Amino acid sequence: MDAALRDICQLSDPCDPRSFEPPIKDFFCIYPMYRSRYEAKAIQGSNEFLDGWNKAIEKDGLRNDGRPFLGCNTIYGNYVAWAYPECLPERAAHVAAYCDWGFFWDDATDAMSMEKNHEATKDLILTIMSTVGIGQKHEPLLAVNKLVVPFVLNKLAGTDGDLGLNHMKAWKAHLDGQARSSHANMSWEELKQHRLVEGGPEWAIRLGAWGAGIRCTAEEIESVREIIDIGGIAGVLANDYYSFNKEFDEHSRAGTIERMQNGVALLMREYGYSEEEAREILKKEINKMEQQFMDMYLTWLNGPVQKSRGLIQYLTMVLCLYSGTMFWMAHGARYHRTDLITTAEDRATIIGKCQGDAFRVMEGYPPPKGLKRTASSPESAPKRRASKANNINQSNGRGGDPMVAFSGPFVKAPSHICDAPYEYIDSLQSKNMRDKFINILNSWLNVPSDSLQIIKNIVQMLHNSSLMLDDIEDASPLRRGQPATHIFYGASQTINSANFSYVKTVIEATHLKNPQCLQIFLEEVSDLHRGQSLDLHWRHHGRCPTTDEYIMMVDNKTGGLFRLMARLMEAESPSPITTPHLSRLLTLIGRYYQIRDDYMNLTSADYTTKKGYCEDLDEGKFSLPLIHLLLHTSCPDRITSALYNRVPSTGLQDEVKTYILDAMQSARTFEYVREVLSHLHGEIMKTLDEAEKTLGINNGVRMLLVGLGL
C-alpha cells in the first residue's frame, strides 16, 4: 500500500501518528497517515477564522458560558494537514476556515433547544441552497450563518464550482439527516446505516475533492461506493467514540439528552452496556471496518478493471481523510475538553433507558456484566408470535355445545389482520415530505393542531394506500428499497388493507370541524382515481399520450394529494386565505415531483437500489422521458414492441433497457427533461414570490422548494 500511496500523494509525506510528543493515549487507528507540506497555510486560515467567529457568536448570543470553540488547530498542527494532505496550497486556508465553521456551528447548535436548532438549520440550508443552487441571495438571520456566504460565493461556487455544488448538496443531506434523526428504539445495525447519512462523511469527502481539485464522474464514484461506505461507518463511529463525553455534556446543558446521536449512547441505552463496555465494542467494530476498507481498497487498486487517475486520487483522498480525522479526534482539544460539568456517573444514568420491554442483544459480544433483566432474543419473540398465530383453537362455542357458535350474537372481527399490510408499508423508511409540507404551509394558514394532525393522518393513509395498490398494478417487487407489501401479504390481502385504509380516511375526514371537508375529500380522491385510470389505460392499450394528456394525468394523480392537503387546511383555518397563486404553486409542485421521479427512475443509482433497475420500463409506464423518446426516435416501433409485446408480468431484459436508455441519450431525452425541470423550478419560484406578496414570507416553503432544484 505504501508504494501506491506515495505515487498518488504528491503534496504530502508519510507520517507516523505514534511518533508525536507527548504520545497520544487512546489512539487505535490502523490506517496509514500522510501530512501536508503546506500545514502553515491551514493554521493561518483557522486562526483568522476564529476571530470572525467569536464576534459572530457574541452577536447571536449563542454561547455565553465563556468556553472557547475548539476546532482544526491542535498541539500537533492542523486537521486539514492530516485529513486533506493533498489539498492544493492555495485552498488550504479556505478549507481549514470552512472546516472550523462546520465544527463550531455543530457545537453551537448542539447546545440549542430543539426549536432554535431547527430555526438555525433552516436559516443555514436556505442560505446555502439559494446562493449555490439557484443564484438568489438570501440574507441569513444569524451572523454565524453569514460567515459561510463569502466562502460559498467566492470559493465553492467559483473555481471548480461544480465540485463546490456537489459538496453543498452533500452538506444539505447531512443537515437533513440530523434534522430527522432519532436513535430511539434503534438496533446497532440500523444505527450504523443511519449514522452514515447523518454523520456527514459525504460532505467531508466532497469538500476534499474540491480542495484537491479532483474530478470524477458520478458513475465512477458510485462504482466505489461500497468501499467508501465501509470506511465512512468506521469514521462516524470513531467520532461517536471520541466525542461521547463532550456531546453528553452539551446535551445535558441544553436539556436534550434524548436527541443525542451517538453509538456509545445507543449501546448503553438499548443494550445495557456500561460506558467502558460500549467503548470496547466500538473499538473492535471500528478496527474491523478499517481493515475491511484497506483490504477492499487494495483489491480494487490492483484489480484488472480499468480506472481513471482521477478516481484513484479520489479514493486515496478518502483513505487519507479517514486516517487524518481519526488522528485528529484521538488528540484534538475539541474532543478532549477539560471544562465538562458532567461526570462518568452522570453518563451512566442513560444505561438501560431503552424504548422496549427488554434490552437488545448484541450479536458476537457477551451480554453486559451488570445485566439485571432478561434480554430479548431476536429469534425468540417471532417464534412465540408464530406459535400463537398458527395454533388452531379447538373450542367450539360455550360450555362444549358445538351448535352455540351458529346461533350466537354478532361479533366484530379484529382489525389487526386487515391492518398488517398497511402497518408494514408505513414502517418503511420515508422522507416524510408530505408532513413537512403540511407543517410549513401551516405558517400561512395557522390550522389548529388537532385538525392539522387529522389532515396529516388522511394524507399519510391515502399516500401509503396508493403505494400498496400501485405496486400491485405495476407488479413492482420493491418499495423504498424493501420488498413491496404484496410480496409478504399477497395481492388480495394488500388490496383489502388498502381499501380498509381508504375507509379510515373517510372516517378521519368526518372528524374535521368544517362540514365542507368531506366534500373536498371526496372530490380530490375522485380526481386521484381518474388520474390513475389514465395511466393504467394508456399502459394496458399501449397508447402513447400527448404531452398535454400526460400533464392532465399528473395534475389529477400526483397533484391531487397536494391540493387535498391545502384545501383541507384552508377549510380548517380560522382565517382562511384564498389566493390563486397558492393553487398554482401546488399544481406546479405536483408536476415537478412526478417529472423528477420519471427522470430519476431511469438515471439514479439510488432509485435502482430502492425500486430496481429502470423499473418504469418494466411497468411499461408512459413517463415523460418515454413519451419524448417515442416522438423523437426514428424507430418507435422497436421500443413499443419490446415494451408491450411480451408475456404479462415479466420484466424487460437489462439489454433491452440499456438499448432504450441509449436511444434516449441519442434523442437528447434526458437533456429535454432537465430543461423541463429547470423551467418548472423557475416557475415554482416565481409563483412563490407572488404567493408571498399575499400570504407573507415563508422561509420554510422557500427552503423546501429551493431544495427541489438541487
Swiss-Prot record:
Catalytic activity: isopentenyl diphosphate + (2E,6E)-farnesyl diphosphate = (2E,6E,10E)-geranylgeranyl diphosphate + diphosphate; isopentenyl diphosphate + (2E,6E,10E)-geranylgeranyl diphosphate = (2E,6E,10E,14E)-geranylfarnesyl diphosphate + diphosphate
Binding site for Mg(2+) 2: D106
Binding site for Mg(2+) 3: D470, D474
Regions annotated as coiled coil: none
Pathway: Secondary metabolite biosynthesis; terpenoid biosynthesis
Pfam families the UniProt entry points to: polyprenyl_synt (PF00348), Terpene_syn_C_2 (PF19086)
EC number: 4.2.3.-, 2.5.1.29, 2.5.1.81
Keyword Transferase: yes
UniProt entry keywords in alphabetical sequence: Isoprene biosynthesis, Lyase, Magnesium, Metal-binding, Multifunctional enzyme, Repeat, Transferase
Binding site for dimethylallyl diphosphate: R479, K557, T558, Q594, N601, K611, K621
Record region (Prenyltransferase): 339-710
Name of the featured protein: Aspergildiene synthase
InterPro entries named in the record: Isoprenoid_synthase_dom_sf, Polyprenyl_synt, Polyprenyl_synt_CS
Binding site for Mg(2+) 4: D470, D474
Record-linked PROSITE patterns: POLYPRENYL_SYNTHASE_1 (PS00723), POLYPRENYL_SYNTHASE_2 (PS00444)
Binding-site residues, Mg(2+) 1: D106
Name of the gene: AuAS
List of residues binding isopentenyl diphosphate: K431, R434, H463, R480
Region (Terpene cyclase): 1-338
Positions contributing to substrate binding: D106, N239, S243, F244, N245, K246, E247, R334, Y335
